[in-house]
Swiss-Prot record:
Residues 11-478 form the UvrD-like helicase ATP-binding domain. Its EC number is 3.1.-.-, 5.6.2.4. The heterodimer acts as both an ATP-dependent DNA helicase and an ATP-dependent, dual-direction single-stranded exonuclease. Recognizes the chi site generating a DNA molecule suitable for the initiation of homologous recombination. The AddA nuclease domain is required for chi fragment generation; this subunit has the helicase and 3' -> 5' nuclease activities. The lineage of its organism: Bacteria, Bacillati, Bacillota, Bacilli, Bacillales. This is ATP-dependent helicase/nuclease subunit A.
Length: 1225
């Protein structure tokens, strides 16, 4: 390291940042904590290489994690070069950089690998016309490769193969086995040499020396729990020693101490002692014993605590015995030998899949992203495994290699970088920046140990190795955010769990000195679920309402400090983000926020396959493909499409309990003479549908099948009408588009498409709606913690902390680990017995530790997004659980290791640490520090713990009292809030050269057009989507949500339109009895719900039947109801058509009738209007005519345009009567 310039006194950089910018002459690792300005440092280093060292920009290789990061980095560098050129216009070097920036290699590693392949394809005998494989082809070719390999083995089955299939498959099929092989494939190709890694898996089972790797780890894990058990036993003893007449209890403790000490004598595990261990029975702690102690002034709590500690001790030893040491050392080693042939066979299957898949891709001349890396590595490596001549050319070309987000690098990427970097660590040209505490992509095979190995190897002075620089000053957050985050992770994270020691170097230090001294404590909300009978809300719904209350409070009472003006401003919606581990709660929040009139956005591209509308369509496709899948069949039947009730489904099943499949039960029920005839009719309709779709799928592509399903059942229209309709519609179109993409591949058929979708689900690959909001849109955002990485928000609400970690992989029969290999239980095919093997026990425990470590790092990412304040929310069932968390055992300065290794959810760790800090009554053995004075300032938290009973919260259904507003409503309602209107207009109007066209919607309903013209607002863009009117039952809230609630005006309006849509026109006029019978018929046919009857304005309908208009319609030649229309607005407005884009008007006419060659239309209105005292009917008529004048004009002109004939019309108000509009428009 040399030539670091002296930092000027007025430099904006910290000493560590300055050093990071100018250090050279050796490999440099910058450990950049959250908010420490790493991107600015990286850009400045690149700029100084160009300006100060006069290195051409295309002589630098800058590797970023995403394409977006690469574009932003290149843009920043380009701007700085331009700025430098303006300041020094005669500098020819800078002028050249303006040209070379476009060829600069600032990209993802995938993009760099692709360039290597494009330039050197001949080295690996690759056709230069290769293309990147599509998702569809990639998924299905891999599936096809697996099929062919398994088919070969099924044809000539080996005993080991049969054992594997039996062990790793379900009772019904081998889908689980296939899924496992796909995971195995993906794990393998994340290694630089997949075949070598696969061979190493077998060696662990065959080589006695390799067994020691597992045995050592088993012993280490066992020690953790035995030592924790012994410590817990000592606590029990200490509590008994404080009591009198507890000698018998102490005798048991003494005996247990002797046994426990024998288990780990000389710090070596005695397997026999543990396997043969049986616990002693502790004498009962009687009321008499408690009373005796109380009489002597000794709290009986000592006895209770002692008993609890002793129970915990027994539980810990039982866990060691049952989890790690069920069988002897020798038995475990024998099992490993027996498993070796099975592992050898499994490895060969995976090798065959790799080869088969590679051959299929090569024959089609396609590459996937893993091929980019492996082919590039192949080009850069000679036959001896050293750098090839091509790699050496790249070494000469690049003066420095800069890697961003180094903690997310995998083994293959590390191998590629090592081939093109110069020198070793002490004199190399590799600059790496990242933060292992933010390594959260293990599911993509990111390997944080690569970062940690260098972190430990490199030194702060760079002596004899690489240079390590810690950027620990945070310029983002208030002191309270940083100190509390430090305090949490100081007591939670270390190398054992978290994979880094959270020491003085890892901590966050306050750097945003412009913040005022206003106190903003971290708020931890423990929401105790109300399970009372009068509250049916689920835990997630309760939490969603609570979150909405917190948002309201922030908006009404909190401020944001503006660094530039050094003043406060009121908090706005865009200052708030809601972070959760996943997005399953998004729909709940969306509904609740709508009730609260809170603008809200969630990027539902994540969690796509979990969305209700997508699951419905997939259930439909799976049922059509194979109705013998009960979950999907029943799911489709219960859906809004077919609306079978749980009682109906139960009745079907009860009739034939012994059927293997629900489909068989349906067939049997339909033949049952005693079956409910209405249910049989409903089933016949359903089965006819399924048969029809099955037949249709045989001769039509999948996308046409989906389109038919959408159109037959108004699927798009229904989901468009729900909360988040735009996103739901985008999700449905996304699935349709995937089917179109599938059809363009070489694969065909519904079965293959479902396999493709299943693979996307397995890979957690989403393709839902795009993020359609900008950074300045004033909405509350919801996103996953993963999505929030790199972002910052004034207020962070980190919720769903009580959601359990996803430990599903730990329950699988085979577990993979890059370092420790493959863990599989031993399965005896003849005896049909499974029991844990040495490998499965060890790898399961290691994988659980790695999983919790990554979850801990996700917590760190979430907490470090906040600038002003953190609000943490968790929900628990009982308040007693909080007391247990407060008393979690500690070891040294941290939560006891065994508790962290077995943690189930973030809330347990966070609450325990903060509650211990705040408690004034906690015993010393549960506390981390005796006094706050003992704490370093960077660790001194500011915390406000709030425990709330849900029943105490206000959960009024604001939906019944509040109405959402749009910009068009503001002026109609008489609002003079011009600032608000302008703000909304500014957000909705995207400025670009063709602004006039963008402010004119491509398609509008007549109602929308009416509001637009009434308010003279133009600039709201409506998405172009087909819309159809459907029955009220699909739009109504579920029955359980409507109980004891009045329908809203718009719901009653829809209900009345449905009644009128089917109303018979009889020349003799309907009687009240006939009308009542007609309404009952609508209920029986499920057109309206039974509870809707009370909201039908019965007398108003009768008044219509008694009217002249009713009789006029009965005498008409033709009657058309609910007629949709779409028409060019220019033609309706009688404007000359031009080449410019036109606007389309769409709408629905309630009724049209033809009489004496003259067309008339009728529009029903259920409006309630205030008739002021003294108003005449004529004045009311004038008011109503004016209100609907524009809408009726467009109805009339539209129909005249379509029919090419004069059209007259009527408005019919249920509260006023008919009104001719033939002369008024």
């Amino acid at each position: 390291m040399n030539n670091i310039p002296i930092k000027p006194k007025d430099a904006q950089w910290t000493d560590a940042q300055w050093k990071s910018i100018y250090a050279n002459g050796q490999d440099v690792l910058v450990a950049a904590a959250a908010g420490s300005g790493k991107t600015a440092v990286l850009v400045e280093r690149i700029i100084q290489k160009i300006i100060r060292d006069e290195i051409d920009v295309d002589k630098l290789l800058v590797v970023t994690f995403t394409n977006l990061s690469a574009r932003e980095m290149k843009h920043r560098v380009d701007q700085r070069i331009q700025q430098a050129s303006i300041e020094d216009p005669r500098n020819e070097h800078l002028k050249n950089q303006r040209i070379k920036i476009h060829q600069a290699q600032i990209s993802t590693l995938h993009s760099f690998c692709l360039k290597i392949i494009q330039q050197h394809y001949d080295v690996i005998d690759l056709d230069p016309n290769f293309r990147t494989i599509s998702d569809v082809e990639n998924v299905l070719l891999l599936e096809q490769s697996i099929d062919e390999v398994l088919e070969k083995h099924y044809d000539t089955p080996d005993i080991e193969f049969l054992t594997l299939v039996e062990q790793l498959s379900s009772d019904r099929n081998d889908d689980n086995f296939r899924d496992l092989l796909k995971r195995f494939y993906n794990f393998s190709i994340a290694n630089p040499s997949p075949f070598e890694w696969l061979d190493s898996l077998v060696e662990i089972y065959t080589d006695d020396n390799k067994h020691k790797l597992y045995l050592d780890e088993l012993e280490r894990l066992s020690k953790i729990y035995i030592k924790a058990a012994y410590h817990t036993l000592l606590e029990a003893e200490n509590n008994f020693l404080n009591c009198i007449e507890a000698e018998k209890h102490l005798d048991v403790i003494k005996l247990e101490k002797f046994k426990c000490e024998k288990m780990i004598e000389g710090n070596v595990i005695n397997f026999e002692e543990i396997i043969n261990y049986t616990s002693e029975k502790l004498p009962t702690i009687t009321k008499k014993l408690k009373d005796t102690n109380e009489d002597e002034g000794i709290s009986s709590q000592f006895l209770t605590n002692a008993k609890d500690f002793f129970d915990d001790y027994k539980k810990l030893l039982s866990e060691v015995k049952n989890k790690y040491l069920m069988r002897s050392y020798e038995d475990l080693k024998v099992d490993m030998k027996r498993l070796a042939p099975r592992i050898q066979y499994l490895v060969q299957i995976v090798k065959d899949i790799i080869n088969g898949f590679a051959e299929k891709k090569r024959s089609r001349n396609v590459l996937d992203f893993s091929d980019y890396e492996h082919f590039a590595l192949q080009i850069l490596t000679d036959q001896e495994g050293n750098a090839s001549p091509i790699a050496k050319e790249y070494r000469s070309q690049f003066e420095e290699i800069l890697v961003d987000e180094y903690q997310d690098t995998n083994q293959v990427q590390e191998a590629i970088i090592s081939k093109i970097k110069r020198g070793d660590e002490s004199n190399g040209n590799l600059f790496m920046v990242g933060d292992v505490k933010q390594s959260i992509y293990k599911f993509r095979q990111a390997d944080p140990t690569l970062f940690m190995d260098k972190y430990h190897r490199f030194t702060k002075d760079g002596d004899q190795s690489g240079l390590r620089i810690d950027l620990s000053k945070n310029f983002r957050s208030r002191k309270e955010v940083l100190a509390t985050t430090n305090y949490l992770f100081d007591h939670m994270m270390d190398e054992e769990v978290g994979e880094i020691e959270y020491d003085a170097d890892a901590r966050l230090y306050f750097g945003a000195t412009k913040y005022s001294d206003k106190s903003m404590p971290l708020e931890l909300h423990a929401l105790i679920q109300d399970k009372s009978s009068d509250n049916d809300l689920e835990k997630s719904e309760q939490e969603a309402r609570y979150i909405a209350e917190q948002v309201k409070y922030i908006i009404e009472h909190k401020q944001v400090y503006d660094m530039k003006s050094e003043t406060y401003r009121q908090a706005t919606f865009k200052d708030i983000v809601i972070l959760e581990r996943g997005l399953k709660n998004a729909r709940n929040l969306q509904q609740v926020f709508k009730d609260y009139n809170i603008p809200f956005h969630v990027n539902s591209k994540e969690g796509y396959f979990e969305q209700t509308e997508v699951r419905l369509v997939l259930s439909f496709l799976r049922t059509v493909d194979n109705p013998l899948q009960d979950i999907y069949l029943v799911g489709l039947m219960r859906s809004v499409i077919y609306q079978f009730t749980e009682d109906e489904l139960a009745n079907i099943r009860v009739q034939s309990m012994n059927d293997d499949y629900f489909y068989q039960s349906i067939l049997h029920y339909m033949k049952d003479q005693e079956a409910n005839p209405l249910l049989v009719e409903k089933l016949e309709h359903f089965m006819d549908d399924i048969n029809m779709y099955q037949e249709y799928s045989q001769s039509h592509p999948v996308y046409q099948l989906i389109d038919k399903f959408y159109n037959d059942h108004y699927v798009i229209q229904y989901f468009s009408g729900l909360i988040g309709g735009k996103g739901r519609r985008a999700n449905l179109y996304g699935l349709f588009n995937k089917a179109v993409e599938f059809e363009n591949s070489s694969f065909r058929g519904l079965y293959q498409f479902i396999r493709f979708i299943d693979e996307l689900i397995e890979r957690n690959k989403d393709f839902g709606e795009e993020n359609v909001i900008g950074p300045n849109d004033n909405v509350v955002r919801m996103m996953t913690v993963h999505s929030s990485k790199g972002l910052e928000f004034p207020y962070v609400i980190y919720s769903e902390l009580s959601k359990n970690f996803n430990k599903g992989d730990l329950r699988k029969p085979l577990i993979l680990n890059q370092k420790y290999g493959l863990g599989i239980d031993y399965f005896d095919l003849e005896q049909n017995v499974t029991y844990p093997s040495l490998s499965s026990v060890v790898i399961k425990s290691i994988t659980e530790k790695e999983l919790i470590s990554e979850e801990m790092r996700l917590m760190y990412v979430a907490l470090t997004r906040a600038k002003e304040q953190l609000i943490l929310i968790g929900t628990i069932d009982k308040e007693e659980a909080l007391e247990k968390l407060e008393r979690l055992p500690i070891s040294g300065n941290q939560i006891a290791l065994h508790k962290r290794l077995s943690a189930d959810r973030p809330f347990d760790l966070i609450y325990s640490i903060l509650a211990k800090y705040q408690s004034t009554s906690l015993l010393p053995e549960y506390r981390f520090e005796k006094s706050i004075d003992n704490l370093d300032e960077s660790l001194r938290p500011t915390v406000d713990i709030k425990i709330a009973q849900f029943e105490e919260l206000s959960i009024e259904d604001s939906e019944s009292e509040q109405e959402s507003r749009n910009i068009s409503d503001l002026e109609v309602e008489g609002s003079h809030d011009d600032t608000l209107k302008q703000q909304i207009n500014d957000q909705l109007s995207f400025k670009y050269p063709y602004l006039k066209d963008t402010e004119k919607p491509s398609k509008q309903s007549v109602s929308e057009l009416k509001r637009q013209l009434e308010t003279e607002e133009s600039g709201t863009s409506y998405e172009r989507v087909r819309q159809y009117r459907i029955g009220v039952s699909t739009y109504e809230r579920p029955k359980f949500l409507r109980e004891n609630k009045k329908r809203k005006a718009n719901e009653i309006g829809t209900l009345m339109h449905t009644v009128m849509q089917h109303l018979p026109f009889k020349e003799t006029r309907m009687t009240e009895t006939e009308l009542n019978d007609y309404i009952n018929e609508l209920i029986e046919k499920h057109i309206i719900e039974e509870d809707a009857k009370k909201d039908i304005q019965f007398e108003a309908v009768m008044n219509f039947i008694r009217s002249d208009l009713y009789m006029t319609i009965t005498q008409a030649d033709k009657v058309y109801r609910e007629l949709p229309f779409v028409v060019n607005q220019a033609r309706v407005d009688e404007m000359p058509e031009s080449d410019e884009d036109v606007s389309i008007i769409q709408g629905m006419i309630d009724l049209i009738f033809l009489k004496d060659d003259q067309y008339y239309f009728v529009d029903y209105k259920t409006d309630a209007f205030n008739k002021r005292r003294g108003m005449t009917d004529e004045e009311v008529g004038i008011q109503l005519r004016d209100k609907y004048k524009i809408q009726m004009k467009y109805y009339k002109n539209t129909l005249e345009t379509i029919l090419n004939s004069k059209v007259y019309g009527y408005l019919y108000f249920f509260q006023f009567g008919q009104m001719s509009i033939e002369e008024d428009v």
